Amino acid sequence: METTNGTETWYESLHAVLKALNATLHSNLLCRPGPGLGPDNQTEERRASLPGRDDNSYMYILFVMFLFAVTVGSLILGYTRSRKVDKRSDPYHVYIKNRVSMI
């Protein structure tokens, strides 16, 4: 009976992802020119009329910027709220201030 290692499936899936990424990066699809090699007006018109691969890239950039802003905003709010809690539970405010007011 053969025992399976839990990292083998993880390693295989990681290898498959890296292999696909490598194939995508080294493929000629990204650098391949259009059907015409020369400066043909029909080629330019076809290229302009076809939907591009990066048409919604600005939406992706805005989405990432929004997520970054939400993350930074939550960190700032969390920090300022924790400072307010620390000020209220400060020993000066709890013990010394009350005793000075009694004198």
Swiss-Prot record:
Q: How does it sit in the membrane?
A: Single-pass type I membrane protein
Could you tell me in which tissues this protein is expressed?
Expressed in hippocampal neurons (at protein level). Widely expressed with highest levels in kidney and moderate levels in small intestine.
A Gene Ontology annotation in the biological process aspect, one of them, is:
negative regulation of membrane repolarization during ventricular cardiac muscle cell action potential
The portions of this protein that span the membrane are: 57-77
Q: What is any one of the record's Gene Ontology cellular component terms? A: perikaryon
Which keywords fit this entry according to its UniProt record?
Brugada syndrome, Cell membrane, Cell projection, Cytoplasm, Disease variant, Glycoprotein, Ion transport, Membrane, Potassium, Potassium transport, Transmembrane, Transmembrane helix, Transport
Highest rank taxon of the organism: Eukaryota
Similarity annotation = Belongs to the potassium channel KCNE family.
Q: Which PANTHER family match?
A: POTASSIUM VOLTAGE-GATED CHANNEL SUBFAMILY E MEMBER 1, 3, POTASSIUM VOLTAGE-GATED CHANNEL SUBFAMILY E MEMBER 3
Q: What is this protein called?
A: Potassium voltage-gated channel subfamily E member 3
